[in-house]
From Swiss-Prot:
It comes from Chaetosphaeridium globosum (Charophycean green alga). This is ATP synthase epsilon chain, chloroplastic. GO terms for molecular function: ATP binding; proton-transporting ATP synthase activity, rotational mechanism. Transmembrane segments: none annotated. It comes from the Eukaryota.
Length: 136
């Protein structure tokens, strides 16, 4: 038995296939979803999603959203999503370093919040690339 996974961003369907297991970053930590999981609605944090398909792990950077699990259907609505295979590793590393520097230099509440969000997004993209290279 498999999970039917559908990941949707405002402008496109990012993923639509079956998988054996999913690991998501929620607001309260990571959660694993297997077939026959109890019904669940959860908020998603900026982070990575790992997907097991035919014995192979792949990953994706998610930029926050919601996940609904019901009757082996997993529907994920996200603000943005990017498959690790679509992310340039060098660009992800450079963006992460720049975001880290901007966060360290941020002053004032608004600038710190914006720099922290940029840092989290850059880290999610880099983590997705790194997870795919380790797991793939």
């Amino acid at each position: 038995m498999a999970l039917n996974i559908r990941v949707m961003a405002p402008n496109r369907i990012v993923w639509n296939s079956e998988a054996q297991e999913i690991i998501l970053s929620t607001n309260s930590g990571q959660i694993g979803i297997l077939p026959n999981h109890a019904p669940l609605l959860t908020a998603l944090d900026i982070g990575i999603m790992r997907i097991l398909v035919n014995g192979q792990w792949t990953s994706m950077a998610l930029m926050g959203g919601f996940a609904l699990v019901d009757n082996n259907q997993l529907t994920i609505l996200v603000n943005e999503a990017e498959k690790a295979s679509e992310i340039d590793p060098k660009e992800a590393e450079n963006n992460f370093e720049l975001a880290k520097q901007n966060l360290a230099a941020a002053e004032g509440r608004k600038q710190i919040i914006e720099a922290n969000l940029s840092f989290q997004r850059a880290k999610a993209r880099l983590d997705a690339v790194n997870a795919s290279s380790r797991l793939g």
